[in-house]
Amino acid sequence: MAKEIFFSDKARNGLFEGVTKLADAVKVTMGPRGRNVLIQKSFGAPHITKDGVSVAREIELEDTLENMGAQLVKEVASNTADEAGDGTTTATVLAHSIFKEGLRNITAGANPIEVKRGMDKASAAIIEELKKISKEVKDKKEIAQVATISANSDETIGNLIAEAMDRVGKDGVITVEEAKGINDDLEVVEGMQFDRGYLSPYFVTNTEKMTCEMENPLILITDSKITSLKDLIPVLEQIQQSGRPLLIISDDLEGEALATLVLNRLKGVLNIAAVKAPGFGDRKKEMLKDIAILTGANVITEELGLSLDKATLDDLGQAGRVVIDKDNTVIVDGKGDSAAVDARVAEIKIQVENTTSEYDKEKLQERLAKLSGGVAVIKVGAATETEMKEKKDRVDDALSATKAAVDEGIVIGGGAALAKASKAVKLDLEHDEAVGAEIILRAVYAPMKQIAQNAGFDAGVVADKIANNSEANLGFNAATGEYVNMLEAGIIDPLKVARVALQNATSVASLLLTTEATVSDIKEAPTPAPTMPDMGGMPGMM
């Protein structure tokens, strides 16, 4: 296929057109008075959202040159969401503002490479200033404030997220699911839960709930498949004498072995239940080790030279309570050594830091949560499916932003932190490097201006008042139209969101400004369908 090549100003101007179209669609969602964007879907009802990254992901432009610019900035929005969890709109607005200012200077004759150098130095200096003015998140109230801001000022969602983080800790897993009704709810599973249910309904002890509940049980863990009870008889006799319930977690338990256990359970000889081991392959081995450490058991595996026929009560784990339904098993109050659990948690944290796979990272974090706290499920309710999708987007955003705030701390919100940090930066640069730095120092006012503009206020007046005020925490509350102490008003942003948004925006704008040529496909006109040949008159017609 033939390619189209554009150079210098023509290339950059085409890219800028694409960036502008994407930014214009995304930036209207910004702030407490941001507008909705309606997205057509190939099937079903249109999707209404105020989530910047959801809007950006849907945009594909017809012009190939413009589309290249839009796709690069779309990537910035996605990367910011992946890394910081929020700040997609901020990153898009910043990238557009930096590119616009930079393009004007480069068209006027500035050296793109020196401009880029100055931009990088100014961006790094602003991030250092942001770190200086940030503060740690100390209590549940501040967590709720961050979550509320990210959820577009929805206090109910903010409080639910704060409650969830309070219950399961910062390493706990918090998931978002759709509720059956219209109300939002929080459900916390304390202890370790894994997605394996009882192997036979005959193990059920609570017929009303169809669950098997065990108090103070012993737990036998093996990676072997059990088909015969012959090897288990010695340890089962010891358990019967102790009078305690037994949970067997094995690779599988079937045939004669399962039938015999069910029979003993029904006769009241043994209070017993069995479940399959969670996970697959190497992950299964690691999860069995996790359960063993949590309960103080030894994993009976041939790899360590252990066999079921030699197992004793010392090899079994213990827990305060176990609840099993047809799909899940929950182990509460494992009696394992707390130092061993802490060491295992530290080991998994190192694996999380070192892994490059997002899937592996997610699974490791789930294991971490199960060992260190528990799992919280935020159930989001809404009257319609369209509202449900929009609300779920907001909860996901708020949850990610809250985790970012706990990680790195918070700064004043509403775009004011970037403006204040910019004002504090003093750089001694010359020539086009100074031009590049000035581009960044001016561009970081764009998010604050956009928030004010979306709320119907004069963006220039708002920016000027905040920039020239010496009060460190002063900002503009776009919801009320007042100038307030942002920390006291609870209008705060995670430092990580502001930092990542500025870094990513500077990076992509630098790439676009130093682009000297573009190569793209020539869009071919569709070939017209061939016309039908003339059939002539049909014979024999009168």
From Swiss-Prot:
Class of this enzyme: isomerase
This protein's name: Chaperonin GroEL
Keyword Nucleotide-binding: yes
GO terms of biological process kind: protein refolding
Subcellular location: Cytoplasm
Catalytic activity: ATP + H2O + a folded polypeptide = ADP + phosphate + an unfolded polypeptide
Superkingdom: Bacteria
HAMAP family reported for this sequence: CH60
Sites where the protein binds ATP: 29-32, 50, 86-90, 414, 477-479, 493
Native organism: Sulfurovum sp. (strain NBC37-1)
Matching InterPro entries: Chaperonin_Cpn60_CS, Cpn60/GroEL, Cpn60/GroEL/TCP-1, GroEL-like_apical_dom_sf, GROEL-like_equatorial_sf, TCP-1-like_intermed_sf
Gene name, Swiss-Prot/TrEMBL: groEL
GO MF, one example: unfolded protein binding
GO cellular component, one term: cytoplasm
Subunit structure comment from the entry: Forms a cylinder of 14 subunits composed of two heptameric rings stacked back-to-back. Interacts with the co-chaperonin GroES.
Keywords on record: ATP-binding, Chaperone, Cytoplasm, Isomerase, Nucleotide-binding
NCBIfam families the UniProt entry points to: GroEL, PRK00013.1, PRK12849.1, PRK12850.1, PRK12851.1
Family recorded in the similarity comment: Belongs to the chaperonin (HSP60) family.
EC number: 5.6.1.7
